[in-house]
């Protein structure tokens, strides 16, 4: 960055840096105690960037995604990991491909239905946050961190029920042992991003988020069937 005269950077961080939160909604100042390698690696980079910002007078914004979800509204860009580990695409795939059996990891968490609760934020809302962060750093210098989510939590079972409403089919699943390193609940307090960046989510309804993901997966399946 220094060699190329670049002074602003936006880093894609994660809610996983907080570990098991002590409050229902997580503010930026919450203690960072990651419990899995992913969260630890992201926190390590945040700390490195803070050191670089001080040493080289760089401007750094860390955007802490909660659960990124959904697809572009025109269904051209969507979520396709291999192997897939994210809940929403796995639920959808289980209805499209019989071989992709849905597994629910843990049903004895201390939540209202025993399954993990997460805060889902649409990918295009996250993209807008990046643009707003870059614009903000044109006027302000330093190190900034923002939690990005809808500030509303949905359990694994809530997501399955939402998918059933969207896809209009009953979804079968098996209960598997809980995965080590999965906090029971992660919900963002995104008030700082709203106040400073002027950021608001356009996709606040979980059914609308899932609908964009389903339309993308459906389109991909149709394309594959044609080939």
Ranges and model annotations:
Residues 3, 7-8, 17-62, 67, ...:
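Catalytic helix-loop patch of NAD(P)-dependent Rossmann-fold dehydrogenases
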Residues 90-227:
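C-terminal substrate-binding subdomain of Rossmann-fold SDR/epimerase-dehydratase oxidoreductases
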Residues 1-8, 136-140:
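A short helix-coil junction within the Rossmann-fold of NAD(P)-dependent oxidoreductases
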Residues 9-13, 61-64, 119, 147-149:
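Structural signature of the Rossmann-like NAD(P)-dependent dehydrogenase/reductase core
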Residues 14-17, 70-73, 109, 153:
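Active-site proximal helix/loop that lines the substrate pocket
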Residues 13, 26, 188:
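A conserved hydrophobic position in a structured secondary element of the catalytic/binding core
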């Amino acid at each position: 960055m220094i060699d190329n005269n670049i002074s602003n950077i936006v880093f894609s961080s994660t809610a996983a840096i907080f570990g098991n939160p002590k409050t229902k909604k997580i503010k930026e100042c919450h203690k960072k105690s990651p419990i899995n390698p992913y969260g630890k690696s992201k926190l390590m980079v945040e700390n490195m960037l803070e050191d670089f910002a001080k040493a080289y007078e760089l401007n750094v914004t860390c955007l802490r995604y909660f659960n990124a979800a959904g697809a572009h509204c025109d269904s051209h860009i969507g979520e396709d990991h291999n192997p897939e580990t994210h809940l929403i695409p796995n639920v959808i795939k289980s209805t499209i491909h019989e071989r992709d059996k849905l597994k629910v990891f843990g049903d004895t968490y201390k939540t209202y239905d025993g399954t993990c609760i997460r805060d889902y934020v649409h990918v295009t809302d996250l993209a807008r946050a990046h643009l707003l962060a870059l614009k903000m750093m044109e006027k302000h210098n330093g190190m900034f961190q923002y939690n990005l989510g809808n500030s509303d939590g949905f359990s694994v079972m809530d997501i399955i029920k939402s998918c059933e409403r969207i896809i209009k089919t009953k979804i079968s699943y098996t209960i598997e042992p809980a995965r080590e390193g999965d906090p029971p609940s992660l919900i963002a307090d995104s008030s700082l991003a709203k106040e400073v960046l002027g950021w608001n989510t356009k996709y606040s309804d979980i059914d609308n988020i899932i609908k964009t993901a389903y339309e993308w997966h459906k389109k991909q399946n149709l394309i594959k069937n044609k080939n």
